[in-house]
């Protein structure tokens, strides 16, 4: 609902970046059982991880970059998102991170990563890279054999045929099938969304951004975010200004999402920006660092900004990930590369090759049906659930986690629109859902206001009932706004989609969109009953 003071929907209904620091998933998973059967093909123990709403791949990249510090394992990352644009961004970001160093240098790769990932506007060279890479991916998606040959780390086999078609359409839009900035006028869309969010406070938006930063984000542990960079992002959508401000003028099409809206009594397909305009992309890589000197203060003020810390962390992350390319090129010289990277222990295996991990994308809306497949039931050693997907934490999903497996739930700590009492209510609700799904709090887990950590109890929780939301639990409507609240007027959007572009998955009727989180969590268990499961290729999981 929109009020004169604004909609309060800064979180948006589509997530483009994470609202928590990147995790090393190996550090969060149970220790390797030495008696467990290793993968017969690769002769290494496997780590199977299911991630709901991880959005930007930061946890996966962090895990891969830290793999050299752990015994060698094969990773199977199963990623489930609620929109295909997020899947496409995963693929683009990973293809960039795994780009051959000979084709793109480390600095260029890190700068391109930051701009594509967190900026609403791009420099022309970065936009050209997005178009070229999107064109390549658009040709690979319909051809599984070529896709497996060129991107051996990627698996789309679980997606439905219509989802693959829609994914191809997303890449073709990014590649410039519809020419000109008028196809996605990002600056106008951003301003329209900001006006809708702030309402009568729009003219005082600088004061609003300073208040949100100092009284909310700084108080919650993100002191390194500088007022100038936060204000610039709130005004323009440009979080990482690595060049002169005039260089950023090409709309970032990877932030576009399609949707069916009601316009004068008719359903109209339109593209727009419905992502975050409140917190920003600074939290994922910008508020923590392995190098403690980046976080030091002088006269009570941080010496580095969140943008500078993000650039340093991403550069180091991509430097570590590039070891796979060198390992593949040099064949067997892994020991020398390990010592060159400075591993802490001589006996620790070197970083794995690209073929030692696979990213599997699961069909949209398949969380309630995964347990019907024997290949998923009790398979995963680690389950990660983002704060916007907590309503999917049900006993059926818990059945997919192996006994003794761990659960990590992202909390709403860095959501600007959430008040302190709402945070406490959300944390309580997370504990209730985790317990109903068969999990118990981890014993000895370090205290955290950002993540809730649980482990799978031995008893099955499939027969449990998720309790209804108690009257005292505050509603968290800002986590998943209905379309009427989160979308600006249709006149503020781009032109309607043309009939030649498939949009069956990215565009959803308002009745199919997620309601407020409290409404979803309060549904009786029968309303969440999964339909019958059919074949993966035709109907998905």
From Swiss-Prot:
<dbReference type="GO" id="GO:0007368">
    <property type="term" value="P:determination of left/right symmetry"/>
</dbReference>
<dbReference type="GO" id="GO:0120293">
    <property type="term" value="C:dynein axonemal particle"/>
</dbReference>
<comment type="function">
    <text>Required for the assembly of axonemal inner and outer dynein arms. Involved in preassembly of dyneins into complexes before their transport into cilia.</text>
</comment>
<dbReference type="GO" id="GO:0005576">
    <property type="term" value="C:extracellular region"/>
</dbReference>
<protein>
    <recommendedName>
        <fullName>Dynein axonemal assembly factor 3</fullName>
    </recommendedName>
</protein>
<dbReference type="GO" id="GO:0008340">
    <property type="term" value="P:determination of adult lifespan"/>
</dbReference>
<dbReference type="InterPro" id="IPR039304">
    <property type="entry name" value="DNAAF3"/>
</dbReference>
<dbReference type="Pfam" id="PF14740">
    <property type="entry name" value="DUF4471"/>
</dbReference>
<dbReference type="GO" id="GO:0072520">
    <property type="term" value="P:seminiferous tubule development"/>
</dbReference>
<keyword id="KW-0990">Primary ciliary dyskinesia</keyword>
<dbReference type="GO" id="GO:0000902">
    <property type="term" value="P:cell morphogenesis"/>
</dbReference>
<keyword id="KW-1012">Kartagener syndrome</keyword>
<comment type="similarity">
    <text>Belongs to the DNAAF3 family.</text>
</comment>
<dbReference type="GO" id="GO:0070286">
    <property type="term" value="P:axonemal dynein complex assembly"/>
</dbReference>
<dbReference type="GO" id="GO:0007283">
    <property type="term" value="P:spermatogenesis"/>
</dbReference>
<dbReference type="Pfam" id="PF14737">
    <property type="entry name" value="DUF4470"/>
</dbReference>
<dbReference type="InterPro" id="IPR027974">
    <property type="entry name" value="DUF4470"/>
</dbReference>
<dbReference type="GO" id="GO:0044458">
    <property type="term" value="P:motile cilium assembly"/>
</dbReference>
<dbReference type="GO" id="GO:0035264">
    <property type="term" value="P:multicellular organism growth"/>
</dbReference>
<keyword id="KW-0970">Cilium biogenesis/degradation</keyword>
<dbReference type="GO" id="GO:0030324">
    <property type="term" value="P:lung development"/>
</dbReference>
<dbReference type="GO" id="GO:0007507">
    <property type="term" value="P:heart development"/>
</dbReference>
<dbReference type="InterPro" id="IPR028235">
    <property type="entry name" value="DNAAF3_C"/>
</dbReference>
<keyword id="KW-0963">Cytoplasm</keyword>
<keyword id="KW-0225">Disease variant</keyword>
<dbReference type="GO" id="GO:0090660">
    <property type="term" value="P:cerebrospinal fluid circulation"/>
</dbReference>
<keyword id="KW-1186">Ciliopathy</keyword>
<feature type="region of interest" description="Disordered">
    <location>
        <begin position="490"/>
        <end position="541"/>
    </location>
</feature>
<dbReference type="GO" id="GO:0007420">
    <property type="term" value="P:brain development"/>
</dbReference>
<feature type="region of interest" description="Disordered">
    <location>
        <begin position="332"/>
        <end position="353"/>
    </location>
</feature>
């Amino acid at each position: 609902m929109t009020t004169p003071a604004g909609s309060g929907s800064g979180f948006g209904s589509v997530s483009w970046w994470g609202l928590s620091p990147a995790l090393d998933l190996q550090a969060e998973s149970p220790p390797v059982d030495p008696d467990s059967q290793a993968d017969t093909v690769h002769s290494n123990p496997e780590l199977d991880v299911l991630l709901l709403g991880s959005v930007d791949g930061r946890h996966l990249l962090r895990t891969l970059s830290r793999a050299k510090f752990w015994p060698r394992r094969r990773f199977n990352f199963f990623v489930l998102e609620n929109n295909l644009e997020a899947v496409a961004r995963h693929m683009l970001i990973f293809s960039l991170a795994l780009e051959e160093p000979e084709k793109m240098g480390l600095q260029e790769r890190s700068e391109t990563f930051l701009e594509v990932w967190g900026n609403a506007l791009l420099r022309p060279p970065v936009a050209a890279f997005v178009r070229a890479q999107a064109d390549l991916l658009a040709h690979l998606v319909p051809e599984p054999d070529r896709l497996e040959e060129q991107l051996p780390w990627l698996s789309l086999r679980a997606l439905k045929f219509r989802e693959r078609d829609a994914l191809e359409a997303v890449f073709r839009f990014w590649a410039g099938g519809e020419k000109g900035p008028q196809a996605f006028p990002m600056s106008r869309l951003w301003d329209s969304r900001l006006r809708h969010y702030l309402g009568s406070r729009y003219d005082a938006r600088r004061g609003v951004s300073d208040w949100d930063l100092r009284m909310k984000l700084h108080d919650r542990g993100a002191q390194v975010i500088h007022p100038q960079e936060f204000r610039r992002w709130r005004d323009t959508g440009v979080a990482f200004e690595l060049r002169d401000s005039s260089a950023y003028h090409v709309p970032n099409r990877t932030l576009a999402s399609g949707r069916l809206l009601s316009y004068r009594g008719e359903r109209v397909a339109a593209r727009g920006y419905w992502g975050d305009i409140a917190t920003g992309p600074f939290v994922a890589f910008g508020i923590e660092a392995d190098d403690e000197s980046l976080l030091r203060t002088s006269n009570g003020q941080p010496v580095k900004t969140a943008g500078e810390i993000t650039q340093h962390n991403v550069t180091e992350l991509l430097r570590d990930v590039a070891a796979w390319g060198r390992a593949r090129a040099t064949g067997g010289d892994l020991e020398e590369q390990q010592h060159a990277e400075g591993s802490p222990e001589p006996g620790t295996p070197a970083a794995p090759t690209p073929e030692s991990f696979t990213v599997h994308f699961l069909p949209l809306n398949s969380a309630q049906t995964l347990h019907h497949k024997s290949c998923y039931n009790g398979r995963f050693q680690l389950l990660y659930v983002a704060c916007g997907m907590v309503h999917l934490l049900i006993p059926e999903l818990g059945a997919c986690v192996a006994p003794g497996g761990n659960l990590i739930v992202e909390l709403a700590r860095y959501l600007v629109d959430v008040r302190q009492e709402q945070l406490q209510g959300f944390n309580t609700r997370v504990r209730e859902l985790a317990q109903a799904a068969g999990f118990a709090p981890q014993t000895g887990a370090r205290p955290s206001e950002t993540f809730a950590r649980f482990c799978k109890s031995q008893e099955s929780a499939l027969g449990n009932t998720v309790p209804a939301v108690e009257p005292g639990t505050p509603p968290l409507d800002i986590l998943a706004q209905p379309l009427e609240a989160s979308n600006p007027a249709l006149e503020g959007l781009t032109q309607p989609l043309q009939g030649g572009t498939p949009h069956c998955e990215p565009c959803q009727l308002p009745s199919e969109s997620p309601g407020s989180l409290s409404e979803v969590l309060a549904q009786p268990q029968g309303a969440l009953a999964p339909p019958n499961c059919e074949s993966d290729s035709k109907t998905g999981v």
